Amino acid sequence: MGKYILSVTLLLLVGGSVAAQETNTVSTRFGALTVDEAGVLLFKSAPFKPTIEANNSLDLGKPFEIGAADVVLVTDNGGTSCPALYYFVTVTKSGAKVSPAFGSCSDLITVKRNGESISVSMPGYQGPSESKRAQLRAARETHVFIYHAGVVTENGKPVK
């Protein structure tokens, strides 16, 4: 009986450590995007240059097939000062390219595909260290980021 309990306990411990090392993966037509256990974004098991590393965690969206490219929205989950920033990864047969980070820090987004473009809309954001007035003013703003042909813009200007 004691051996049985020890065996079950060991199985639970081993199973728990495997679950803690799970990776986040999305398949594209041209290879897999993966977030490794350290929170680094990989394409075909290799990190991007410069490295895209999670603040707290990275979430990978479902790929959009746009012509000869698959486009994936990546969410970089942060903390209370900036809950989320975003990247688009454009994956083609010749490789993968990451956009500059964009967003207002809000994690409340609406994503829509419009033909060959993708829009990401969100309210403005001011963190808890800002005044309530500043937080309310920011929440009334709407920021719209447009992905088209590998470029992300806000108000017609490229995000840098």
Predicted regions and their residues:
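Repeated scaffold domains used in trafficking and secretory/extracellular systems
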Residues: A54-F64, S104-R113
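Bacterial N-terminal signal peptides that target proteins for export
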Residues: M1-L6
